[in-house]
Amino acid sequence: MSRRRVVQKRPVPPDSRYNSRLVSMMVRRIMRHGKKSVAHNIVYDALATIEERTGSDPLELFEKAVRNATPLVEVKARRVGGATYQVPMEVRSERGTTLALRWLIHFSRTRSGRSMASRLASELMDAANETGSAVRKREETHRMAEANKAFAHYRY
């Protein structure tokens, strides 16, 4: 780690259509090879699909999906005297949101379906209903932390 001064976190500006920082974060995570307009189209199409299928506010459902996929604890590897322990650590809110978005996008990409927008919409709706791969990943992370509770005193 650098011993110089700490780098200031740059604020994420809210997106233009929904005025939401979360949507903006999602767009930035979906973007590949600097093609932000393509990422915008994917996210906006997914939210439009959600509105079409459910008839409710897509932003509300999106926020609920992210909340349901956000982990509260995770395990980190810590080496102590030749042995590596999986130490459970609490997740800060910002990291939790980042992990949730990462998992939602990852499992959207691995889903079967035609377009990325439809796959993302399906994954978001599943996460909002507390099903789907991203929520399962969160529960798996919580189970790992629970199983390794004995090593919690190695926290750093």
Swiss-Prot record:
One of its GO terms (biological process) is translation. The keyword 4Fe-4S does not apply. Belongs to the universal ribosomal protein uS7 family. It comes from Arthrospira platensis. Keywords: Ribonucleoprotein, Ribosomal protein, RNA-binding, rRNA-binding, tRNA-binding. The keyword rRNA-binding applies. One of the primary rRNA binding proteins, it binds directly to 16S rRNA where it nucleates assembly of the head domain of the 30S subunit. Is located at the subunit interface close to the decoding center, probably blocks exit of the E-site tRNA. It comes from the Bacteria. The lineage of its organism: Bacteria, Bacillati, Cyanobacteriota, Cyanophyceae, Oscillatoriophycideae. This is Small ribosomal subunit protein uS7. Part of the 30S ribosomal subunit. Contacts proteins S9 and S11. Coiled coil: none annotated. Gene3D superfamilies: Ribosomal protein S7 domain. One of its GO terms (molecular function) is tRNA binding. One of its GO terms (cellular component) is small ribosomal subunit.
